């Protein structure tokens, strides 16, 4: 027998159907933020074009709320050679919409010449070392306060490879180099997240809109429309993972989970102290001064 929850599910399906008719990309940039010349920088290591949007809530908030300069590197442009030029342009447009900068990695030998996967690290150590050195030069040039990259168990070979390459790139910089690190999750949950970051509906709408600029990918699979559901599930899961079993959910309907640490003395050190939940209306200044 039909009941009120049928109406709820029917409405959810209907809004998804209507959302499929929304334009992909082609939107004017979101309102800009004035960035100081000496502003601290976030550097996102995106395994593929689109990851800068999917796990970009932290970077977006730091950009908008604290004036951080955000730059993204496409560590690869995907496995399809015929799509690489288009994917680079799609990422450029998505970054432009959000107010991020795109750092072209392909002139540095990244973006396709070497498969950024664990087996390459094992089977082609010279090619891997060249890619790590190239990425290290990018990091050294831009000197980020915060480096964002996938965690080491994020299932997808290129996500795991990007983590390994990022760590190896940091090792090329010597023991004096220091920055904060935020590990992300997408294909596989973090084993020990220590930050649940609330995402406002307006920020989420901009992330979904930015993701829609990756037109060639979302036409195949409209995964930009499932980003709100993923972020809603992060609240369900993160509230008890960080707050303890039986903890009440946070105040935000949407969130992203991260693992924060510091790269110092040639290694990644976990963030000291208890895990934290930062609501969309809370300041990030204590974590990212």
Residue positions per predicted region:
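Acidic, Ser/Thr-rich low-complexity intrinsically disordered segments
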Residues: 249-273
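A conserved mid-domain beta-alpha-beta active-site/ligand-binding segment of alpha/beta enzyme cores
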Residues: 188, 193-250, 256
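Active-site beta-strand->loop->alpha-helix modules in alpha/beta enzyme cores, enriched
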Residues: 1-177, 190, 212-213, 265, ...
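Acidic, low-complexity intrinsically disordered regions
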Residues: 8, 102, 124, 226, ...
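Short, flexible loop segments at boundaries between secondary-structure elements
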Residues: 171-199
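Short, intrinsically disordered/low-complexity patches at protein termini
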Residues: 77-79, 105-106, 180, 229-232, ...
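Residue-level detector of alpha-helical recognition elements and their boundaries
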Residues: 106, 162, 181, 221-222, ...
């Amino acid at each position: 027998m039909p009941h009120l929850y049928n109406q709820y599910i029917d409405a959810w399906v209907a809004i998804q159907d209507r959302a499929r008719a929304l334009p992909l990309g082609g939107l004017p940039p979101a309102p800009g933020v004035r960035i100081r010349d000496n502003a601290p920088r976030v550097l996102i290591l995106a395994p593929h074009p689109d990851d800068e949007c999917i796990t970009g809530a932290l970077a977006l908030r730091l950009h908008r709320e604290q004036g951080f300069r955000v730059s993204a590197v496409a560590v690869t442009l995907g496995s399809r050679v015929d799509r690489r030029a288009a994917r680079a342009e799609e990422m450029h447009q998505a970054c432009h919409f959000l107010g991020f900068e795109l750092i072209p990695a392909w002139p540095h030998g990244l973006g396709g010449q070497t498969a950024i996967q664990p087996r390459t690290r094992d089977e082609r150590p010279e090619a891997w070392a060249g890619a790590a050195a190239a990425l290290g030069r990018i990091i050294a040039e831009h000197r980020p306060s915060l480096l964002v990259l996938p965690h080491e168990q994020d299932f997808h070979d290129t996500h795991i490879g990007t983590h390994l390459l990022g760590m190896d790139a940091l090792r090329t910089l010597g023991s004096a180099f220091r920055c904060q690190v935020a590990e992300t999750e997408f294909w596989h949950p973090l084993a020990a997240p220590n930050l649940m970051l609330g995402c406002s509906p307006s920020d989420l709408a901009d992330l979904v809109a930015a993701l829609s600029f990756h037109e060639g990918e979302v036409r195949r699979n409209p995964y930009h429309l499932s980003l709100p559901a993923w972020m809603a599930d992060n609240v369900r899961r993160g509230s008890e993972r960080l707050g303890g079993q039986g903890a009440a959910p946070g105040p935000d309907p949407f969130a992203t989970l991260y693992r924060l640490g510091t790269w110092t003395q040639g290694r990644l050190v976990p963030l000291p102290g208890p895990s934290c939940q930062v609501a969309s209306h809370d300041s990030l200044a204590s974590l990212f001064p």
